Design a protein with these regions (language model features):
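Alpha-helical transmembrane-bundle signature of multi-pass membrane transport and export proteins
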Residues: 1-418
Length: 418
């Protein structure tokens, strides 16, 4: 009987995926524990929204720089060191929570430092995917990484974070810190060197940044996808930054059941990751992208209009599945269309816009909740805006195909009609 052995490329993908999965589990625990910790220090919706804004603000400040850096160094090493840095920051936060010396302002500082390390870890990790998966398996690989993100951050991290916070407030932060250590150790199994253009003549960081931005400026499809991605992030974060208040105040859930609510979202996210490649095969990338944005909007609008826990949980699952499908399409388009040596810089520019829109949306969402009187109303507004965004995407992409094209064609701005 023949024994099937995995290829070196398969094993490298497994090591990177394992590290990403554990890192996402740690991140998921923190994404629930930090807002819950914040609600013990303040119940002001603007201050709660400011926590999300603080976590993502580094993408506005350092996203481009992080992208340029990961195009100059070994990407595996950059990801490893960033995970170690995140572990240290959360370890110090654990001590603050345990001793009772934590304040909302210290929470903001920790969130800012974590977000800064995340710009390196995410840029490096995302740029590694084509190197370990290959162009022919990008759709499948991106679906696996999306599934790992949803499984870790929502399906497991959410319930673990809320349950352990209810037991002992410092416990989830301890698990969070340990998880990033494990994620860093797993990267040691990723053999090979991952420095782009190794051996090339040294260049100035500023020149590298300019080269990446010039390439993006001459790629009309990527420009449109960046705009659509940024608007999707902004309109979605209006509501997502208020999720903890929506669950605790509008739905009257407890801290522990908030994790179960997130668990349903995890189920939807996993379904979206599993179905996305099949949907792309059946319909193409563009219908999945546009339809996914529209369904996200309908789900959030429904959550705002029908504030019943079971209905809201189901709709949140629908939202999670749809947003994962959207993310798979966007990630695959980036990897397929951007040259490998420019991937870090283009990703940095992309994340600066898309993830930089998140703190803006979070702050606006906090203001909307204060103005309208409930987080549920903010969900309704967010949903209607996302439905409108789906219509905008139809117009913006009407002359373009999202099927993989050689990077040089995009560099010339090649267009194709449907």
């Amino acid at each position: 009987m023949a024994v099937r052995t995995s290829s070196p490329r398969d094993r490298r993908l497994e090591w990177l995926l394992s590290s990403s999965a554990i890192g996402n589990l740690a991140d998921g625990i923190g994404k629930v524990a930090f807002p819950l910790l914040a609600t013990t220090l303040t119940h002001d919706p603007v201050q709660i929204g400011a926590l999300s804004a603080t976590q993502f603000a580094p993408w506005l400040l350092f996203g481009l720089l992080a992208g340029a850096l990961v195009d100059r160094v070994d990407r595996r090493r950059a990801m490893l060191l960033a995970n170690v840095g995140r572990s240290v920051v959360i370890g110090l936060t654990t001590i603050g929570v345990w001793t009772g010396s934590i304040s909302i302002w210290l929470v903001y500082v920790a969130a800012m430092l974590l977000g800064t390390a995340e710009t390196i870890a995410e840029s490096a990790g995302n740029a590694l995917i084509p190197a370990v998966a290959g162009q022919d398996r990008l759709e499948s690989a991106n679906s696996k990484f999306q599934a790992a993100e949803i499984l870790g951050q929502v399906f497991l991290g959410g319930p673990v974070g809320s349950a352990t916070f209810a037991l002992f407030a410092a416990f989830p932060f301890l698990l969070n810190s340990a998880g990033f250590v494990v994620a860093a150790v797993l990267l040691l199994g990723l053999t090979g060197r991952y420095r782009p253009n190794e051996g090339a003549a040294p260049t100035k960081l500023r020149a590298d940044l300019v080269d990446g931005l010039k390439w993006l400026a001459r790629a009309p499809l990527l420009r449109r996808l960046v705009i659509i991605g940024g608007l999707t992030a902004l309109t979605g974060e209006l509501a997502q930054a208020q999720l903890v208040l929506y669950a605790l105040d509008d739905l009257q859930l407890s801290n522990a059941t908030f994790g179960l609510f997130a668990f349903v979202g995890g189920i939807g996210g996993l379904a979206g990751a599993a179905l996305a490649p099949r949907l792309v095969t059946l319909t193409g990338r563009k219908p999945v992208l546009i339809g996914g944005i529209g369904v996200c909007g309908l789900a959030f609008a429904g959550m705002g209009l029908f504030r019943q826990p079971v209905v809201a949980a189901v709709l949140f699952g629908v939202f999670a599945g749809s947003v994962v499908a959207v993310n798979v399409v966007l990630a695959t388009a980036r990897h397929a269309l951007v040259p490998g040596e420019l991937l870090g810089r283009v990703l940095g520019a992309w994340r600066t816009v898309v993830w930089g829109a998140i703190p803006v949306g979070a702050l606006l969402g906090g203001g909307l909740t204060r103005l309208l009187g409930s987080a549920g109303a903010t969900f309704a507004v967010s949903g209607f805006l996302q439905v409108a965004l789906a219509g905008f995407a139809v117009l913006a992409l009407r002359r373009f195909s999202l099927s993989a094209e050689p990077a040089h064609d995009q560099h010339r701005g090649a267009e194709r009609s449907h």
